[in-house]
């Protein structure tokens, strides 16, 4: 294994040096596996491979990682206890929490996000699962790469996060050409659909807290890329944030105003017409866009129910899930709003929609909820 030596001038040179990744896990098997995956990537290097959170805290300054993959359950010092100490010792450190799919670990992962962790990833529970963990490998490498890319951009992006009131308009996109916006369709919205991935849990809680008047009168359906158990916990958090009922969608459940429906982990949430309304259909088919649940199945299936009466929001996340479904929503007469780059943890999904020219608005997260309230009240200005 090539373990990197810290280079303080890494970003001052003419080229960017490989991403430095610290792997912290008490399982030697998982540590070795993740380390080998990282070493196989041309743009990454293992900064350190450590057994406990205490080791990580003691060595983080010397190892100088860009990213830490941090297990939750470890001896001496567990991940949730090590997290604030690591962030205090290294500014802008990206920490990805790794845990098995238990309710306790899901709760801890959500707490870690509130304490400053950048993301989480579900970890295979046995060595037999690990040996064939292609999805785990794919997701981990992509998370490391995309989260680090955002942090490595000029600090000018950070200034755009300030929540000062600004006119409702498309936000300048620093690293891409400005998206071409469509005029808002005048179809009256009848349902709100939301898709999100990396950074989504925090963004969703901010969003639902500000759209109470919308939830009271219209159904809200959300697909967040997330595994089983985690979606159960997320629904509970969304209910508290919104002050309205929120739960995982149930097969053949009738969709009603006043409720938030969340796609359950491991199954796509689709919609089907029933009379004048809609029912939820849980789909155990193949992953779409490498995801299950995926956003596109929700978006496309909703058209059969509400046609042009759909308002879709695409929040922070990796990849392009939601873009194709958004295209079909727009073609049916609906509207799409995307989160802007500056306020996104990763501007993959919303960026794909914005660059495809299907958005009527590209907005900072803090401006999306007020805009939705106005749109559902009939104000399309």
From Swiss-Prot:
This is Protein-glutamate methylesterase/protein-glutamine glutaminase. GO terms for biological process: chemotaxis. The keyword Hydrolase applies. The keyword rRNA-binding does not apply. GO terms for cellular component: cytoplasm. The active site is at residues 197, 225, 321. Contains a C-terminal catalytic domain, and an N-terminal region which modulates catalytic activity. It comes from Nitrobacter hamburgensis (strain DSM 10229 / NCIMB 13809 / X14).
């Amino acid at each position: 294994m090539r373990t990197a030596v810290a280079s303080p001038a890494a970003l001052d040179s003419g080229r960017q040096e490989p991403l430095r990744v610290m792997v912290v896990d008490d399982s030697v098997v998982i540590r070795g596996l993740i380390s080998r995956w990282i070493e196989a990537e041309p743009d990454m290097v293992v900064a350190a491979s450590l057994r406990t959170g205490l080791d990580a805290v003691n060595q983080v300054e010397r190892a100088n990682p860009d990213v830490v993959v941090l297990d939750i359950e470890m001896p001496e010092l567990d991940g949730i206890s090590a997290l604030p100490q690591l962030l205090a010792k290294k500014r802008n450190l990206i920490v990805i929490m790794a845990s098995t799919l238990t309710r306790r670990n899901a709760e801890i992962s959500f707490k870690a996000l509130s304490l400053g962790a950048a993301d989480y990833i579900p970890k295979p529970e046995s060595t037999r699962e690990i040996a064939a963990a292609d999805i785990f490998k794919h997701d981990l490498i992509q998370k490391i790469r995309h989260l680090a890319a955002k942090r490595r951009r000029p600090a000018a992006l950070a200034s755009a996060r300030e929540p000062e009131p600004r006119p409702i308009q498309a936000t300048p996109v620093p690293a891409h050409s400005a998206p071409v916006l469509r005029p808002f369709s005048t179809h009256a919205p009848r349902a709100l659909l939301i898709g999100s991935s990396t950074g989504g849990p925090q963004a969703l809680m901010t969003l639902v807290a500000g759209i109470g008047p919308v939830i009271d009168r219209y159904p809200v359906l959300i697909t967040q890329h997330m595994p089983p158990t985690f979606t159960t916990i997320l629904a509970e958090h969304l209910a508290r944030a919104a002050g309205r009922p929120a739960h995982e969608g149930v097969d053949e459940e009738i969709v009603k105003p006043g409720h938030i429906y969340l796609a359950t982990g491991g199954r796509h949430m689709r919609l089907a017409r029933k009379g004048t309304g809609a029912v939820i259909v849980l789909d155990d088919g193949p992953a779409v866009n490498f995801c299950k649940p995926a956003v596109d199945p929700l978006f496309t299936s909703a058209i059969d129910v509400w046609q042009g009466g759909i308002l879709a929001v695409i929040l922070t996340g990796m990849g392009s899930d939601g873009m194709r479904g958004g295209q079909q929503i727009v073609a049916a007469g609906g509207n799409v709003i995307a989160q802007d780059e500056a306020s996104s943890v990763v501007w993959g999904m919303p960026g794909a929609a914005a660059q495809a020219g299907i958005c009527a608005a590209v907005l900072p997260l803090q401006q999306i909820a007020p805009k939705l309230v106005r749109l559902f009240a009939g104000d399309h200005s």
